[in-house]
Amino acid sequence: MTMHNSVEFQDAFDVIVVGAGHSGCEAALATARLGCRTLLLTLNLDKIAWQPCNPAVGGPAKSQLTHEVDALGGEIGKMADRTYLQKRILNSSRGPAVWALRAQTDKREYAAIMKNIVENQENLSIRESMVTDLVLGANDEVIGVETYFGVAFQCKAVILTTGTFLGGKIWVGNKSMPAGRAGEFAAEGLTETLNRLGFETGRLKTGTPARVDKRSVDYSKMQLQPGDEEVRWFSFDPDVWVEREQLPCHMTRTTPETHRLIRENLHLSPVYGGWVEAKGPRYCPSIEDKIVRFVDKESHQIFIEPEGRDIPELYIQGFSTGLPENLQLQMLRSLPGLENCVMLRPAYAVEYDYLPATQCYPTLMTKKVAGLFCAGQVNGTTGYEEAAAQGIVAGINAARFVRDQEMIVFPREQSYLGTLVDDLCTKDLREPYRMLTSRSEYRLLLRSDNSDQRLTPLGREIGLIDDRRWQLFTRKQEQITGEKERLYATRVKENDEVGKAIASNTQQAIKGSITLADLLRRPGFHYVDLDRYGLGNPELTPAEREGAEIDIKYSGYLARQQSQIEQIARQAQRQLPRDLDYTTVETLSKEAREKLNKVKPMTIGQAARIGGVNPADINALLIYLELRQTKHQTGLAALP
């Protein structure tokens, strides 16, 4: 770290964002759009918002994050809607709480459009540079950054979004080189600066599969995976929707020969060979991990996905590996359809430094250094969507910090985004964190379709939702409310022709009469069925019809979950004293005292979600707080 009195600044900004990946772009755009003079520093101006692994956005829980970022005024959803190659709804046979939109994207088009957006954003400057040091003020607050070549920039807040570049090292077999990703050098010096400031850092690992030439594969031996006929959208803004021809993906499977090659050469893998000890992502394992962990499984699905419309590269999803390059081609050619494939880029593993996010407040500002924020993979997450969500949170709060406004904590019962940040800041995570629907106890309320209803009013209040978007939002909500009123008020009689037809076709009798809302509550009956009987409203958009149907069909479950939230919230939002020394609370278990003192939760709800803190500890803590408050009030009463 460098102290302010020894630095000459070249320029001054309100906010500096370090790293221009998916987190950095959201953070920089948010601060700039909120009126802060922002500098976005990146190692390579040609790799802004690059998708170094799977060029895709969405999937289970990740699509909810993408919708939520858009609802707040962010960019990732718009980008996916502009650049998709294929779109599919996953889990469509299940309830709306777990529906997941996934888009395969054109990675070069995605990066080019995002680069154009950040280059033309008012209040935002971009520059190629490697940040190696932080400049601190007299009170150990951040006041600037210094680059590898000795240039310093002044600022009031810094957002670190360094991805896999901090101390990055890529591995192919037992060969390694310093790099944040293939062909790009690692960031040096910043980890050492953070360690000197007292931050704990650790190492994590991830990987990416080989890329093959699409002209060298035989699709006839694979299973076709087409996109959905009805295209859905991540963004709530129709102006960014682009109707385009979809490209197919394909599926193949591993064979006994694939498994033999991997098992016989496990000792050549960087992890199984003992050269890399960093923990990899549990929910996106390498192919060698799959073979070891699922010994009884005879075959694994492998998806063959295009990386762009105008390039020959195919992404081999589910086949990431750190095995030697000369072995990788044999493995690829053991897959049906890839017997004669040409490998364009080898697979590799990458290990990198991260900061356990328990060192951050839920605002994503660090606890040790005022004005320093962290977002994305540096916080121990994996995935573009998780990174983008943290980026917009850090950007919003950095802008508010600069303006001396109260920073925003997103409660976990309000959004997946809030669940993500809350988990990161309260749980001692030692492996890359991926968002899952199962991580949210409120997932029935936190659906993709109502992300705007939950977050757009907040985005408007913050200043990221303009008048046009606000009008779109309010009209949609008015239409849904009006349609629900109509559905509750309109009745179908059993003796009407339409009533007889419905009873006959559904094999369910109508006794006297029934409201359209009660029809929608019936299993297997949907709004499209109302249309079939001339009972729908043709003036509504698909999103408005779906919103009304879901609210009515699941109203009982929604009300029950809302009641649970309110009950928990009565105690969960209770503030914990900042100066509370948990080691002195003898009624807490030893582990709870240690964990609580390390994390320093802001509320009872956060304390309850810390690993190692059980319900008995929470009860003991509540009793302690009551006794402390009583003692304080007694002391005040005794004063003359």
UniProtKB/Swiss-Prot annotation:
Keywords: Cytoplasm, FAD, Flavoprotein, NAD, tRNA processing. NAD(+) binds at residues 280-294. GO terms for cellular component: cytoplasm. It is found in: Cytoplasm. PANTHER family: GLUCOSE INHIBITED DIVISION PROTEIN A, PROTEIN MTO1 HOMOLOG, MITOCHONDRIAL. SUPFAM superfamilies: FAD/NAD(P)-binding domain (SSF51905). This is tRNA uridine 5-carboxymethylaminomethyl modification enzyme MnmG. The lineage of its organism: Bacteria, Bacillati, Cyanobacteriota, Cyanophyceae, Nostocales. Signal peptide: none annotated. Its cofactor is FAD. GO terms for biological process: tRNA methylation; tRNA wobble uridine modification. NAD-binding protein involved in the addition of a carboxymethylaminomethyl (cmnm) group at the wobble position (U34) of certain tRNAs, forming tRNA-cmnm(5)s(2)U34. It comes from the Bacteria. FAD binds at residues 19-24. GO terms for molecular function: flavin adenine dinucleotide binding.
